UniProtKB/Swiss-Prot annotation:
Similarity section: Belongs to the universal ribosomal protein uS5 family.
Gene Ontology MF terms: rRNA binding; structural constituent of ribosome
Lineage: Bacteria, Bacillati, Bacillota, Bacilli, Lactobacillales
Notes concerning its domains: The N-terminal domain interacts with the head of the 30S subunit; the C-terminal domain interacts with the body and contacts protein S4. The interaction surface between S4 and S5 is involved in control of translational fidelity.
Signal peptide limits: none
Source organism of this protein record: Lactococcus lactis subsp. cremoris (strain SK11)
Protein name: Small ribosomal subunit protein uS5
Transmembrane segments: none
Pfam families from the UniProt entry: Ribosomal_S5, Ribosomal_S5_C
NCBIfam families: rpsE_bact
UniProt keyword annotations, A-Z: Ribonucleoprotein, Ribosomal protein, RNA-binding, rRNA-binding
Length: 168
């Protein structure tokens, strides 16, 4: 009973977005085996976001597995208001994503998989450019890589042993 309540609370805490569903085949002696691979992004629109992949013979089961994997793979995104603290370049495989902070009210200028990650992270004002590969999994991983590189001014000041006012 308590397990169900915890799962219900988790359900309401995170929003999920299916980025891609891919039909994959494995050739065996008797023919082809069909499976589905799902890529899902989850986030609370408050600075926490994660992604996961799942594979199964049915689409709903693949999505469920991907959601579980995404919830185990959450990162926290440092934000300044509704935008990013500074520019970042995320790289994964052939995918490169350039993330730039934008002025308040600019909105999310990003496409496809990048938009899903940024919106579910709660970033409201950002500009992005996808360079290189446009494969959804590489784009999502590169975006998450870019978000993990972000640091607040306070963190940088502490690392350098200076005060925040020295950076102004």
């Amino acid at each position: 009973m308590a397990e169900n309540r915890r799962n219900d609370r988790e359900q309401s805490e995170f929003e999920e977005r299916v980025v891609s569903i891919n039909r994959v085949t494995k050739v065996v002696k008797g023919g082809r085996r069909l499976r589905f691979a799902a890529l899902v992004v989850v986030g609370d629109r408050n600075g926490r976001v994660g992604f996961g992949t799942g594979k199964a013979q049915e689409v709903p089961e693949a999505i469920r597995k991907a959601i579980e994997a995404a919830k185990k793979n959450l990162i926290t995104v440092p934000m300044v208001g509704a935008t990013l603290p500074h520019e970042a370049l995320g790289v994964f495989g052939g995918g490169k994503i350039l993330l730039k902070p934008a002025v308040e009210g600019a909105g999310v200028a990003a496409g496809g998989a990048v938009r899903a990650v940024l919106e579910l992270a709660g970033v409201a004002d950002v500009t992005s450019k996808s360079l290189g590969s446009n494969t959804p999994i590489n784009v999502v991983r590169a975006t998450v890589d870019g978000l993990t590189q972000l640091k607040r001014a306070e963190e940088v000041a502490a690392l350098r042993g200076k005060s925040v006012s020295d950076f102004a």
